[in-house]
């Protein structure tokens, strides 16, 4: 199977890929959700390409072509299926390079592979679409190489040109917004990275042979809303993931760590709700809103409700939600490497975050104390320094105009303000404190909240670094540079840095080798140098050591246990 889904190998290369295509066809016939997003099936008799889970009648084998990327299928002249909707598939091959066993290799890569992945991450990032990334010269400049070099490396690795990859990414984003929301076409064009409605219409019709407004028929039928859900106070979209997924474990993790006034988990309804502040690229001030994720039972689907006030940053919010819930993980590849050592943990995911700075502060607050105590400190911090939450209402264009108005789409009136919709949860009325707020916080007041001086210094150093732009805490940031920058700050050692890398940077190979509970789970606690023994033991789990850590903690039932059992002294430095 790996030959057919390798991103740098065409589906007609050799006899090996023919056999792999046969395996793809078998997955297609059985609608195996484990392969969703790992390949797309193009049907020559219809000109349409589909996800492996598409519910239409299975096409004949001789009419099928298989592509690792949607961009490759579109480059070959195929259009996305309107029923299975390829834009909803979990991210697949573009998340990394593939080894012979089908696993993504993050830790050991050649320079060309790293460059191709960096380019893809830039093209995937919604913030870049509205922040000047609109040409090959800009992409090459950000990567520090020539246009010719980045084009050659990208095409060799991904099988399509950078511009074709980017165009497909934008058009599929637009397709989802057109289908699932009632946003004006002009706003969809803007959010999808197009400079004008005319360019958007030309690209959409040219690629899909379909007018953008034609997709409104699908949206008018409900857009996939569940029982009791309404799109009146929110944008409602769906997201897919590959099974297995331990929903109960993920929700329990969030419930154990939730901060009162800012987030809430309902285990019965399988929902997690929280507030969010986000600053779109080029905006003068942040947008404030709320998000809710509801796991649909007996389905590999999450319904995402996003307040209309976050509409101007919708693609960015969607990307963060997927990372927060770890929806793009590939359980098949991960389990192939880990299941022998961690049986019964097939569905465990690594919880992410919606805000890297928030996660870093919460990690510092949790050093050397129990999770319950860390929650108490977090609740006090949010109550004292968190900004009161008000949701912006009114027209979507007015909300956008208030933050980062494009001249062509400027709205005449500002939005009104009101509280969180009562259909959600009362009591969610605060936002997590911003970096500027915590950087200016009075140490005496922080002390009155129960935060010791060492943690105060660490939190304020984090805030200053984020404000100065010397520390980036989001997926795609340079892991080595970020971890070095973190450990250069007072009060932050290897354990905290690895924990931040694991959850905020979404680095799948993070491994806090000094973790005491990890030593116990691996049975190395009595060795002379347990940290070195744990590091040596972990080598066979690369590049999925973050998942191994979560599975080891679950073995001891310490995912929600006292952090003081897990974290070594924060002053410790790597050898």
Write out the residue ranges for each language-model feature:
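HhH-family (HhH-GPD) DNA N-glycosylase catalytic core used in base-excision repair
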Residues: 1-575
